[in-house]
From Swiss-Prot:
The keyword rRNA-binding does not apply. L-methionine binds at I437, G438, S439, E490, D605. Belongs to the vitamin-B12 independent methionine synthase family. Keywords: Amino-acid biosynthesis, Metal-binding, Methionine biosynthesis, Methyltransferase, Repeat, Transferase, Zinc. This is 5-methyltetrahydropteroyltriglutamate--homocysteine methyltransferase. Binds 1 zinc ion per subunit. The gene is metE. Its cofactor is Zn(2+). GO terms for biological process: methionine biosynthetic process; methylation. L-homocysteine binds at I437, G438, S439, E490, D605.
Length: 773
């Protein structure tokens, strides 16, 4: 039988126990001892799940109260100076302050930058790197968890982000710093970590190096060789884990490293297996990621067993089996989904079920397969056949509409300068117009109303009335604060993707299919199982009502097609581009209906546009072609006088600014405050033709930004972008904040805009052209 293991397991708990405990701790409702107790209980439960399934190794080190990359920063003592002297040990509250800006103890400070983890919807805390930075072993947490698992009798394999990937994910904060200048100091600490793990009796350590699936410069390839030649002297065996794609140009580098085994992703890049097998050294283990760690579809175990049989014959006991990547990216347990349509449920496998798939596959490849294993494989094959034949998946009318799409459907009526003239006449906005990104706080009352509606305790009519009250409250607050372009606040929306998916055909929803996005923030991605279409308008009545309450312009709020795709579990029986075009056509109808209802501005959020970018640059053009095509297909139905906004967050834009400009949105708002407007450096060499709103405060931190801080950020922006094309706005939506935090921050933002108008030009008087309706 092949050795089975996972690269990582979801840490949040099947019922989001970790979320509830951490948020209770932040609010002072429980103490740190209670929080730690919850962590121990979850770890024990997750380790036991792996053991009960029959895995050969139990993976330890994947747990984090906030983020596993942040855990490594704490382990290395890489704490930015603004958080004070962490001393010899980085405590839990210090990591929370790094992540959130504040914690129950310690002084508040600006939170560390947060961005997407490779091409996933998981966010990590970016390590801050400084010249002459010193590293040292500064946390016992990993070793304590190993002791916990060994005390429970588990066969422990430790997982840890590798030293090169940790540096690759970091950001140089000192001018001219080459991150590789810090490698020797980092590797020194890794050597100490491996030594202590060996002393604890650990045999295998999995070092995650997904940076190896990206295009690495030659000096980084050489750095891998230098670092791992030093680490090979340790007392433990090293499994180099790569995932999220194929090794590509780094294949020789990875295979020649002095490690005891290597893991490759055979879901994202099955074609790399042949080259790896041909060059694998005879003493090395090969771990194959053959169960999809990023999607929820059941695997065809019999087909996998047939494919892998020759590999098993060739490698024998050196063949390990695993998911393609950590199971962090899928929901915990399908057994909790008692309300899913039974046919669809048979097609799925969540993290807990993927453990079973893995073990059955291992037995099928060995000499231990029993009748139950053969039955499990037969059931999986039958489920796949049922899915392929299902009449719920394909719709003739969707296919016919896709065939009718032509070039004119992707083109606005006039170029931006002419559109801008018409929009300025219609909207009559001042210099440095202010707006928000869309959502306002989802209060306990809003969430209770949604729960009551689902439970039948609140009628649809009563729920509608409650949401109208919330919209009226949000509109009134915005008018009092003095914002220029308003939003309805999205009180009725549970999630920016789920809300739309619930109203589109071809989507299904879970009750407990939660996945960690960052920290305590969890999302419940929809499952796109079939052709997508829009039976009826989704947002129009809410935006139309909000506009009736004010003479100021109201923005309609839509989630863009690429983001809906990226933040869903997507069907794997057709190209993702085809599914995205179906979503774009559905949203196009919503844009047309919003415009017909008199909404003068429509925001089509695409925060996940860059997230979908392939990790290897040679694959970028194909993706960007269809992603831009889908946005334009959604937006181009709008008339010239309707202002189209888009929003992007957590993105490095330098390498795709051409594609972003090709979207041809009239206004783009972006996340820039955590990076201190560094993202705007791209505009020194690229003249973005349309309007832009660089975020002036970090909504992920509860700290209130000062007026001077926001003025300074906008002055930096004004050095790169003409002031007549600048907007003033937060980084992102305000859903996760409280009104007590939101109002002072927005008041300061409006005050900053007024100062900027005085400095850069005479403030214009609003001419309200719409009036109350």
């Amino acid at each position: 039988m092949s050795t089975t293991h996972v690269l990582g397991y979801p840490r949040i708990g099947a019922r989001r126990e970790l979320k509830r405990a951490t948020e209770a701790y932040w609010k002072g409702e429980i103490d740190q001892a209670e929080l730690e107790r919850t962590g121990r209980e979850l770890r024990a439960r997750h380790w036991q799940a792996q053991r009960d399934a029959g895995l050969d190794w139990v993976t330890v080190g994947d747990f984090a109260f906030y983020d596993h990359v942040l855990n490594v920063s704490a382990l290395l003592g890489a704490v930015p100076p603004r958080f004070g002297d962490a001393g010899e040990t980085v405590d839990l509250d210090t990591t929370f302050r790094m992540a959130r800006g504040r914690a129950p103890t310690g002084e508040p400070a600006a939170a560390c930058e947060m961005t997407k983890y490779f091409d996933t919807n998981y966010h990590y805390l970016v390590p801050e790197l400084h010249a002459d930075q010193r590293f040292g072993l500064a946390s016992r947490r990993l070793f304590d968890e190993v002791a916990e698992a060994r005390a429970a009798g588990h066969p422990v394999k430790v997982v840890l982000t590798g030293p090169l990937t940790w540096l690759w994910l970091g950001k140089a904060k000192s001018p001219g710093l080459d991150r590789l200048d810090l490698l020797d100091g980092v590797v020194d600490v890794y050597g100490e970590i491996l030594q202590q793990l060996g002393e604890q009796g650990v045999e295998w350590v999995q070092l995650d190096e997904p940076a190896l699936v990206q295009d690495l410069p030659a000096d980084w390839q050489q750095a891998y060789e230098r670092a791992y030649h030093r680490l090979q002297a340790g007392p433990v065996k090293l499994l180099l884990a790569t995932y999220f794609g194929g090794l590509g140009e780094n294949l020789s580098t990875a295979l020649n490293l002095p490690v005891d085994g290597i893991h490759i992703d055979c879901v994202r890049d099955p074609d790399q297996l042949t080259a790896v097998l041909d060059r694998l050294l005879p003493h090395k283990v090969l771990s194959l990621g053959v169960i999809d760690g990023r999607n929820v579809w059941r695997s065809d175990l019999a087909a996998l067993a047939r494919t892998l049989a020759p590999v098993r014959e060739r490698l024998g006991e050196r063949l390990w089996l695993a998911p393609s990547c950590s199971l962090l990216h899928v929901p915990v347990d399908l057994d909790l989904e008692t309300e899913l349509q039974p046919q669809l449920r048979r097609w799925l496998a969540f993290a807990r079920q993927k453990l079973d798939e893995l073990v059955v596959l291992g037995r099928l490849l060995g000499d231990r397969a029993g009748a139950a294993d053969e039955q499990a494989a037969a059931e999986a094959s039958a489920a796949l056949a049922d899915r392929q034949a299902s009449t719920h998946i394909h719709k003739a009318e969707v296919a016919e509409r896709m065939q009718r799409v032509g070039p004119a459907d992707r083109q606005r009526g006039q170029p931006y300068p002419e559109r801008a003239r018409k929009q300025r006449k219609r909207l009559a906005l001042p210099l440095f117009p202010t707006t928000t990104i869309g959502s306002f706080p989802q209060t306990a009352e809003i969430r209770a109303a949604r729960r009551d509606l689902k439970a039948g305790r609140l009628t649809p009519e009563a729920y509608e009335a409650r949401m109208r009250e919330e919209i009226a409250f949000a509109v009134a607050r915005q008018e009092e604060i003095g914002l220029d372009v308003l939003v309805h606040g999205e009180a009725e929306r549970n999630d920016m993707v789920e809300y739309f998916g619930e109203q589109l055909d071809g989507f299904a929803f879970t009750r407990a299919g939660w996945v960690q996005s960052y920290g305590s923030r969890c999302v419940k991605p929809p499952i796109i199982y079939g052709d997508v279409s829009r039976p009826r308008p989704m947002t129009v009545r809410w935006s139309e009502y909000a506009q009736s309450l004010t003479g100021r312009p109201m923005k309609g709020m839509l989630t863009g097609p690429v983001t809906v795709l990226q933040w869903s579990f997507v069907r794997d029986d057709q190209p993702r581009s085809e599914t995205c075009r179906q979503i774009a056509l559905a949203l196009r109808d919503e844009v047309a209906d919003l415009e017909a209802a008199g909404i003068p501005a429509i925001q089509i959020d695409e925060p996940a546009l860059r997230e979908g970018l392939p990790l290897q640059q040679r694959q970028w053009p194909g993706y960007l072609d269809w992603a831009v095509d889908c946005f334009r297909l959604t937006a181009s139905v709008a008339q010239d006088a309707t202002q189209i906004h888009t929003h992007m967050c957590y993105s490095e834009f330098n390498d795709i600014m051409g594609a972003i400009a090709t979207l041809d949105a009239d206004v783009i708002t972006i996340e820039t405050s955590r990076s201190d407007m560094e993202l705007l450096e791209v505009f020194e060499g690229f003249e973005y033709p349309n309007e832009i709103g660089p975020g002036v405060y970090d909504i992920h931190s509860p700290n209130t930004p000062s007026v001077d801080w926001m003025v300074r950020l906008m002055e930096k922006a004004a050095r790169r972008i003409p002031v007549e094309r600048l907007w003033v706005n937060p980084d992102c939506g305000l859903k996760t904040r409280a009104w007590a935090e939101v109002e002072p921050a927005l008041q300061n933002m409006v005050a900053a805009a007024e100062i900027l108008r005085e400095r850069y030009g005479q403030a214009q008087t609003r001419v309200a052209t719409q009036g109350k309706r």
